[in-house]
From Swiss-Prot:
It comes from the Bacteria. The gene is lolA. The keyword Kinase does not apply. It is found in: Periplasm. Gene3D superfamilies: Lipoprotein localisation LolA/LolB/LppX (2.50.20.10). Its main location: periplasm. The keyword Chaperone applies. It comes from Wigglesworthia glossinidia brevipalpis. Residues 1-20 form the signal peptide. InterPro entries: LolA/LolB/LppX, OM_lipoprot_carrier_LolA-like, OM_lipoprot_carrier_LolA_Pbac. GO terms for biological process: lipoprotein localization to outer membrane; lipoprotein transport. This is Outer-membrane lipoprotein carrier protein.
């Protein structure tokens, strides 16, 4: 196969490269258009974390609800329950292992966090990133030296259906999220608030 590839004329290889990797500006526009198709969804999700050597560190299952512009709730059930929830103003992060709730304003959420980028999806957000894509797979690299990640991979189809999210951390740990979207409309009476469990330690950072 490699021999055959070497025999291809240079201009064909160049054309294939251009086809496979759209320009950064084109990729950014395509990704933004697809994310704009997402208004809300409910999905089951599988999470897998691997170390820099590829060993599986953790596997879990959960659920996630997202409703633009800034409503979301996610629950991971194993190995212990973790909940992240926002009512549009307040962000709650609950860790059942330590029985601790961390509270913050949603406006203070890190601007380059993957969830923030997917929900907000505005032009200003993508100016801080280099983006390339091959078909439905988008590779996102931060221009900031102090970014919270090295690379994000988003797989989203032309209908705006989110399939996968892969986050490569600065320590070379990878977190894989596989989505199985069940609904694209969330009821208006769905509760995005979080009820703090009795006896939980509260770390209020507002």
């Amino acid at each position: 196969m490699f021999y055959l590839i070497k025999k291809l004329p240079k201009f064909i290889l160049f054309s294939l490269y251009l086809y496979a990797f759209s320009s950064i500006s084109d990729s950014s526009g395509i990704l933004s258009e697809r994310l704009n198709l997402i208004n809300s969804f409910y999905s089951t999700v599988r999470q897998k974390v691997t170390s820099s050597s590829g060993d599986i560190v953790q596997e879990s299952k959960g659920e996630i609800w997202i409703k633009k512009p800034n409503l979301f709730k996610s629950i991971l059930f194993s190995p212990y329950e973790n909940i992240a929830s926002s009512d549009g103003n307040t962000l709650w992060l609950y860790d059942s292992e330590t029985n601790q709730v961390t509270i913050n304003w949603i406006k203070n959420i890190i601007s380059d966090s993957p969830l923030y980028l997917i929900i907000k999806n505005n032009k200003n957000s993508w100016e801080n990133f280099n983006i390339k894509n091959i078909n439905d797979t988008f590779y996102i690299y931060s221009k900031k030296l102090n970014s919270s990640f090295r690379k994000i991979t988003i797989i989203i189809d032309k209908k705006g259906i989110l399939k996968n999210l892969i986050i490569l951390s600065n320590t070379n740990y990878k977190t894989y999220y596989t989505f199985n979207i069940k609904k694209t409309i969330i009821s208006s009476d769905f509760n995005f608030n979080f009820k703090i469990p009795k006896g939980a330690y509260i770390d209020d950072q507002r």
